[in-house]
Regions:
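Single-stranded RNA-binding regions, centering on S1/OB-family and related RNA-binding modules
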Residues: 1-86
Length: 86
């Protein structure tokens, strides 16, 4: 997990959606969560209006917990479907 750092923009694949957020796979090695509050600044009634299972999108790494290996992601500050990583 050392190659992934907070504030990085990374490509992820959406693997699951719940009422509280979306689960994403990172490089087939790690899993992350995009909490519903990190999808848009506006009210999100249905996450599927923004992303769906199987979508390959870009997300910003907000937090990495090295102890639990949990990665918190966000898409609300980037163009998550068109962003190109530098």
């Amino acid at each position: 997990m050392s190659q992934i750092r907070e504030k990085d923009i990374i490509k992820v694949q959406i693997t699951g959606i719940q009422k509280y957020g979306a689960f994403a796979n990172i490089d087939n090695n790690y899993d992350g969560l995009i909490h519903i509050s990190e999808i848009s600044y506006g009210y999100v009634k249905n996450i599927n209006d923004y992303i769906n299972i199987g979508d390959n999108i870009y997300a910003e790494v907000k937090n990495i917990d090295d102890n639990t290996k949990k990665i918190k992601l966000s898409i609300k500050d980037i163009d998550y479907k068109k962003m190109v990583k530098n």
